[in-house]
From Swiss-Prot:
<comment type="subunit">
    <text>Homotetramer.</text>
</comment>
<dbReference type="GO" id="GO:0004055">
    <property type="term" value="F:argininosuccinate synthase activity"/>
</dbReference>
<feature type="binding site">
    <location>
        <position position="274"/>
    </location>
    <ligand>
        <name>L-citrulline</name>
    </ligand>
</feature>
<dbReference type="GO" id="GO:0000050">
    <property type="term" value="P:urea cycle"/>
</dbReference>
<keyword id="KW-0067">ATP-binding</keyword>
<feature type="binding site">
    <location>
        <position position="125"/>
    </location>
    <ligand>
        <name>L-aspartate</name>
    </ligand>
</feature>
<dbReference type="GO" id="GO:0006526">
    <property type="term" value="P:L-arginine biosynthetic process"/>
</dbReference>
<feature type="binding site">
    <location>
        <position position="121"/>
    </location>
    <ligand>
        <name>L-aspartate</name>
    </ligand>
</feature>
<dbReference type="InterPro" id="IPR001518">
    <property type="entry name" value="Arginosuc_synth"/>
</dbReference>
<dbReference type="InterPro" id="IPR014729">
    <property type="entry name" value="Rossmann-like_a/b/a_fold"/>
</dbReference>
<feature type="binding site">
    <location>
        <position position="177"/>
    </location>
    <ligand>
        <name>L-citrulline</name>
    </ligand>
</feature>
<feature type="binding site">
    <location>
        <position position="186"/>
    </location>
    <ligand>
        <name>L-citrulline</name>
    </ligand>
</feature>
<dbReference type="Pfam" id="PF00764">
    <property type="entry name" value="Arginosuc_synth"/>
</dbReference>
<comment type="similarity">
    <text>Belongs to the argininosuccinate synthase family. Type 1 subfamily.</text>
</comment>
<feature type="binding site">
    <location>
        <begin position="10"/>
        <end position="18"/>
    </location>
    <ligand>
        <name>ATP</name>
    </ligand>
</feature>
<dbReference type="InterPro" id="IPR018223">
    <property type="entry name" value="Arginosuc_synth_CS"/>
</dbReference>
<dbReference type="InterPro" id="IPR048267">
    <property type="entry name" value="Arginosuc_syn_N"/>
</dbReference>
Length: 400
């Protein structure tokens, strides 16, 4: 008896997910495989991927467009949260996984499948993200993960696919594992596994090397409404157009490269290369606008929330009650995060050079050291005495 009758497979057209189709049918006795490819702005020829799944043995090959949903339902909340895993990674790949899982569950329910499947291995984070998201959305569905169990080396996996007539795109001269969507691009494996070796330029695709960036900086004004980016340089833009334009501009100036040693949930460290031009600029600009419009206490408290929020996304807990509760807090903080931030993009750096908001808490008459100073300097002495009183009493007791 097979492990399932009908399975919906998250399909990318790569080695592992392509091999999953014959493996599910011939090794695990699955009667029918429905391949689901999701358009996340990766720029792939989805018609070719759709046809490849059918050649590999899928009974159906479906494509779902989800670029808009990825940005509005996943990236925008992350921007409001200034979400950076370990203070560096803006979660471009991790944010896409709960969306793919949601679509897997929806299609499985539509076609009457009793299981869903993915091509994640047993060493990565994505297996956790898929399994937990699917369980949260439909705990009755089985989750199959052939690549986690089949025990084949990369070479054996390729050979298995070739046995069933599946063309393999990975070449020995380019052995990187790539993930791409409109939020960013990740690369790992190959020579990148040498943590002490500088990544070759061929690893990058969205950003220019510093030597090839323009000598003159570019300036861009980003408009936010309640923490959501809505326009560039005075022009209102939809989410997709905004990301496309900012990815192009920031990438041209070499902005958004990340080379980091990352702590995976499964307990290992991994060397990851990310390119997230627009997402990094937006998070930085958003934080600058918050500095202008939020109170000190809210900003300082939100730092801890942002760290937890980022960890939840990274660790596959997007659909958890805690993430939803934190979202409620974050949304409440964003009511006044409306305004415009001016960023300078130059030689790999994005620097804020101006910010304005109708809800600005910055008061020049209180901040100035020149004429027009309205700060009551006489109040400082009493404030300092009361503020330091506990320390003063402690010192009297312990130091005489």
């Amino acid at each position: 008896m097979g492990r399932a009758k009908k399975v919906v497979l998250a399909y990318s057209g790569g080695v592992d997910t392509s091999v999953c189709i014959p493996y599910l049918k011939h090794e695990w006795g699955v009667e029918s495989v429905v391949a689901l490819a999701v358009d996340l702005g990766q720029g792939a020829e989805l018609e070719a991927i759709q046809a490849k799944a059918l050649r590999a043995g899928a009974e159906q090959s479906l494509v779902r467009e989800a670029v808009q949903a990825l940005i509005t339902d996943y990236a925008f909340p992350a921007i409001q949260a200034n979400a950076l895993y370990e203070q560096r990674y803006p979660l471009s790949t991790a944010l896409a996984r709960p969306l793919i899982a949601k679509l897997l569950v929806e299609v499985a329910e539509e076609v009457g499948a009793d299981a869903v499947a993915h091509g994640c291995t047993g060493k990565g984070n994505d297996q956790v993200r898929f399994d937990l998201a699917i369980a949260a959305l439909n705990p009755q569905l089985k989750v199959l993960a052939p690549a986690r169990e089949w025990g084949m080396t990369r070479e054996e996996t390729i050979a298995y696919g070739e046995r069933y007539g599946i063309p393999m795109p990975v070449q020995k001269s380019s052995p990187y594992s790539i993930d791409l969507n409109i939020l960013g691009r990740s690369a790992e494996a190959g020579i990148l596994e040498d943590a002490d070796r500088e990544p070759p330029e061929e690893v990058y695709a969205l950003t220019r090397p510093i030597s090839q960036t323009p000598d003159e900086p570019a300036y861009v004004e980003i408009e936010f409404e309640q923490g959501i980016p809505v326009g560039l340089d005075g022009q209102r833009l939809g989410p997709k157009a905004l990301f496309e334009q900012l990815n192009s501009l920031a990438g041209l100036h070499g902005v958004g490269r990340i080379d980091m040693i990352e702590n995976r949930l499964v307990g290992i460290k991994s060397r990851e290369i990310y390119e997230c031009p627009a997402l990094m600029v937006l998070i930085q600009a958003h934080r600058e606008l918050e500095s202008l419009t939020l109170t000190r206490d809210v900003i300082h408290y939100k730092y801890g929330i942002e760290t937890t929020y980022s960890q939840l996304i990274y660790n596959g807990l997007w659909y958890s009650p805690l993430r939803e509760a934190l979202d409620a807090f974050i949304r409440a903080t964003q009511k006044s995060v409306t305004g415009v931030v001016r960023m300078r993009l130059h030689k790999g750096q994005a620097v804020c050079v101006g910010r304005r908001s109708p809800y600005s808490l910055y008061n020049p008459e209180l901040a100035t050291y020149g004429e027009g100073d309205q700060f009551d300097h006489r109040a400082a002495e009493g404030f300092i005495y009361i503020w330091g009183l506990p320390t003063r009493v402690w010192a009297q007791v312990h130091r005489g």
